[in-house]
Amino acid sequence: MKAKTLTATLALILLAFAQADYDVASYCQLVQSGTKLPSLDSCQNYYTCVSNGLPTLSSCSSGYVFNKDSQQCVPTGSFNCFFGVANPCQNQDKKFVPSAKQCNEWHYCLAGAIAGTGTCKEGQIFNFAKQSCVYGECSNTGNNILDSPNLSVCQIMPNGIYFGDNKNCSTWHKCSGMEEKKGTCPNGDNFDPTYASCVPSNMPACSRIQNPPSTGVVSGPPSTSPCSLGTVVGDLTSCSVYYKCENATRSNSTIWNTYTCSGQFFDVISKQCTSTNQARTLKGCNRCQFTTGSMYWVNAVDPQCSEYFTCSNGLETKSTASTCGAGNFFNEDLQYCMIGNSTVGQYAQTHGACENYTCNPNTRLCNLVTATNTTSSHR
């Protein structure tokens, strides 16, 4: 490797990453149904993209790893994978390997151990096959991977396939090794991931990019005035709208005044505007509000945390929730069902829909089921 290409900082280091996975559902919107994408947590794990459904998580059997390019499990050692490994230099000697942190970093290996680490020049990323830095950008398509690491989209997408863009309807991408090619459909056409090709702009190929509509639909307060002064309740339809019983300005009576949380939901327990994932909302209000794209999933109000809604452009695709099944729970952050529920208590501490609370359907007043509820301590 040429010294002018890499800037080395030699040091003996121990590398142990707890790798966060990325927003798989967003990437699945850019490819054909059935495409498999790698997990960043383990070389054995991968996701299968499903049309109008949650990506499904699978795992290769012992002794095998997932190869994103062949789209199948292959024997360990026949494919170089560096995701979720404690030591990326294992079984590597006198070679450069990619850093699991971000795509423009590399490590130099000696006798299976990290002997040095460095960073490519600005505008370059590390290419393991070429053992050098090549021109490219980390997350340069705008399809940003969530929560570190900052990777190149070509570390996620299979080689040789055309895939879409989540910001421009007419743009397509294609990976060749670590090198990404980008183009635009001619004549104002749009790129349709379903067919992996350009189609006329009048075909419904771009719902993944459309902004969520503002329906303006609300249920109204729970009763006509007068109301009990100081009472604050949520709306049955819009999770961001709430009503406060206040003194009327032109009479001695009380009336319901309407308020709206900006980009947040109304929390029916704390009576405050709260982030959408933390807010405890009325069952039945639109928890898909503020989501973007043609496919996204959110927790439904469910103390077991197994139910979820499918969202499209800020709206629920159906009035009834889907379920992960008994004993499992839906993780809105990772966008898939978690097998087992051993960590659901910890998850519920920051995801209000999974807390155990009840609401009177007539008054809309809500309370935690028990005062010692473990999920209420963070409020």
Swiss-Prot record:
| Tissue and organ expression note | Larval peritrophic membrane.
What GO annotations for molecular function exist for this entry? chitin binding
Matches recorded under InterPro entries: Chitin-bd_dom, Chitin-bd_dom_sf
Q: How is it modified after translation?
A: Glycosylated.
Pfam families the record matches: CBM_14 (PF01607)
Outline the extent of the Chitin-binding type-2 domain: 25-83, 86-143, 151-208, 224-283, 285-356
Q: Which cysteine-cysteine pairs are annotated as disulfide bonds in the entry?
A: C60-C73, C120-C133, C185-C198, C324-C337
Q: What domain of life does the native source organism fall in?
A: Eukaryota
Segment forming the signal sequence: 1-20
GO cellular-component term (any): extracellular region
Please list the residues annotated as glycosylated: N150, N168, N247, N252, N341, N356, N373
Keyword tags: Chitin-binding, Disulfide bond, Glycoprotein, Repeat, Signal
Q: What does this protein do?
A: Binds chitin and may bind related oligosaccharide structures.
What protein does this entry describe? Peritrophin-48
Task: Give the originating organism.
Answer: Chrysomya bezziana
